[in-house]
Amino acid sequence: MLFRSIAYGKAYAALSMGRPSRLVLQKQREKPVFMENLMDLADGPMFLEAGGQLIRDAAGEVIGAIGVTGDTGEMDDVCATAGIHAAGHKTCADFTDPKVIRGINVKEAKPQISTP
């Protein structure tokens, strides 16, 4: 039963932070105090280890997340990616736009210029 909780925590970390869980782990290592405070605010359990991936459609929009556990974090990531691709979807790594790779997919608006 613990495996299910770990997988859920990886998926939740990816979905709530908008990036693969391995990048959330990296951010935790870079800014531990910030991430500790952020995790206190989270609505669910985040498990910070590789294996949580965002599921994206062809346009790069997030449509869900998956968490995989049972092997090393790196192999869990490989399995998550394989499952996403087998289902016909995409991961952050399938896009070259840096905003999508970081887990952000925003539609940029043109700057509004107001004149007096």
Q: Which residues fall in each region the model found?
A:
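A charged amphipathic helix-loop-strand protein-protein interaction module that recurs
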Residues: 5-35
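Residues in flexible loops and secondary-structure boundaries
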Residues: 14-16, 23, 32, 63, ...
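A broadly tuned preference for mixed-charge, low-complexity surface segments
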Residues: 27-47, 104-116
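Extended hydrophobic
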Residues: 40-85
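Juxtadomain coupling helices with adjacent low-complexity linkers
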Residues: 69-116
